[in-house]
Amino acid sequence: PALDYVVCKIPRWDLGKFHGVDKELGSSMKSVGEVMAIGRTFEEAIQKGLRMIGQGMHGFVENKELVIADLDKALREPTDKRIFVISKAFRAGYTVDQVHELTKIDRWFLEKLMNIMDTSRELHSFMADGELPMIPVDLLRKAKVQGFSDFQIARALGLEQAMDGEEAILAVRNFRKSAGILPVVKQIDTLAAEYPAQTNYLYLTYSGTANDVRYLGDRKSIVVLGSGAYRIGSSVEFDWCGVQALNTIRQEGYRSVMINYNPETVSTDYDMCDRLYFDELTFERVMDILELENPHGVIVSTGGQIPNNLALRLDAQKVPILGTSARSIDNAEDRDKFSAMLDRIGVDQPEWRALTSLEDINTFVDKVGFPVLVRPSYVLSGAAMNVCSNREELERFLKLAANVSKKHPVVVSQFIEHAKEVEMDAVAQDGEIIAYAISEHIEFAGVHSGDATIQFPPQKLYVETVRRIKRISREIARELNISGPFNIQYLARENDIKVIECNLRASRSFPFVSKVLKINLIELATKVMLGIPVQKPDKNLFDLDYVGIKASQFSFNRLQKADPVLGVDMASTGEVGCIGSDTSCAILKAMLSVGYRIPEKNILLSTGTPKQKVDMLSAARMLQKKGYKIFATGGSSNFLTENGVENTRVYWPSEPERQPQALDMLHRKEIDMVVNLSLIHISEPTRH
């Protein structure tokens, strides 16, 4: 039997989130997710797949240039960026044979990749100043068959210089449509054409003449945009939300349509929805599908950040977005607009400024004081954010953050120490909250909310804090006229409440709070977005007689040389949820579930500042009472001895002649648990 399509599965790595990690690939798995791309040619499938990974790549060609000092060396070493090194080598004039010699990758693959490069060169030869050149229709068709996106074609033709990216994409799109170059929808036929295909597994391709599916045009379908590749920060939580939305859509009598390309998800199972498009979540591809489907509406709020980012662009093309409007989503996502809105309704937030010069940064820091949170503008999701606690750290970090300029401002925010982080997950209808869940982080604010241990219902919040959070959430929901799911993160210190951010979509804690509360918040939200009247649940978070804990799973043991200190950048790769009769019981279950072992006899304490030593004292006394033998380093050892806690002093490698050495004891596995609080809390490039 012959199959008429080719499938490409590509891993997603997030090694950039770990400081000092070894990027070479080997026998230990380092990827955190994967994508699956389907096309009629290898070239089409691999280019689709490289876009799907979602790391800012547009395909095999037309990406931002990688800076590589030694191409030969880079080709020899297998890293997560290897395919883009091959692209750069081809661009630099390497032949297939040369690359084969250095990489030992089969020539068949390299020849196919070279075909893409040849087409790219042909497109470059038509480069014009600012307007769409008359390129041969055959060349345009060939590029599309090889999986080039409209953006890649626009960039190869030099349209980016004269117009913004959005205009360039639309110019190519309109030209392509006028030339009759349109994708067709093909059905995955697992029966090799021996019987009629049964599945509703669909993909789009330019190598075909007719659609395999009949479109009724009855506007009875609802399209749900999926969550894409699993990665650090967006994983199965958003898939759960998407699946709950699909189930609700089906129950309410609509045709459910899913667009997603992650083979690990439940939403890409063939029987989960009426139609599954196993294809890209890019603006171009989503528009191709929507023009064919002509749906009643599109849901962008259950798939995490990827669909959320498409809302404004889809709205500009008159796509009916269900639930909260695209303008409201933009008002919450855009820092300036959101900040202005909070000021208007009298809600407090940590002070922040987007600054364009070192003098401005120093003036602002003099006003709010250290520590401050610094975020260079050209990065996403906590990547390259840093907490700086003095002027020296700030200057060192800004050197790493590339140039501070008008084009690349740096956002500096006041960082509030010893504040609790509290999350509000809720569903609203026309600006009125109908169901909510307030959960508290066990760690102080400053650890990314995806790495924090979360407790729900909250056990240690003042009643007044909860009351204020509910009031502020109501005001924000009304102001943004929210219909659907949303999440607001708060800082609470005493009863002083500040808003960190607001996301007008389901958050990663929705599945956890839905399960603990036993109310399916996404089902409620989907009904709201479909315009179906819903009852307010009569359940309150204070009615629960148990506690839920969500704890994070880390994979540092697979990542050689990575620094395991947590900070504002998310590093966990999974999570567990446990329920217990009280906090201690639930936390113990959660810690055992993520693989921590209860220490048996020896514990090493090494605490940094005097305040930390005082904070640690009662715990040290308790451990001693339980029969643990305590080891401690320098200052900690003296402090414990002065306060009547018996301990054995151990030494750091900086005093090699003294015994016992802490590291030797760790190597010999004589210590069961280490509590190590460093003096300075800062990420790797600036840590001594």
Predicted regions and their residues:
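Residue-level detector of conserved catalytic or cofactor/ligand-binding positions
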Residues: 678-688
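Short alpha-helical "recognition helix" segments of helix-turn-helix
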Residues: 99, 153-154, 682
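Glycine- and acidic-residue-enriched helix-capping/strand-helix junction motifs
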Residues: 232-253, 614-630
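ATP-dependent carboxylate activation and anion-phosphoryl transfer catalytic cores
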Residues: 1-126, 132-139, 143-147, 166-168, ...
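Active-site rim loops that border cofactor/substrate pockets in soluble metabolic enzymes
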Residues: 270-275, 279, 639-666
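Conserved N-proximal alpha/beta basic substrate-recognition cap immediately N-terminal to
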Residues: 274, 284-348, 363, 683
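A conserved helix-loop-beta module that forms one wall/lid of the active-site cleft
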Residues: 324-385, 641-651
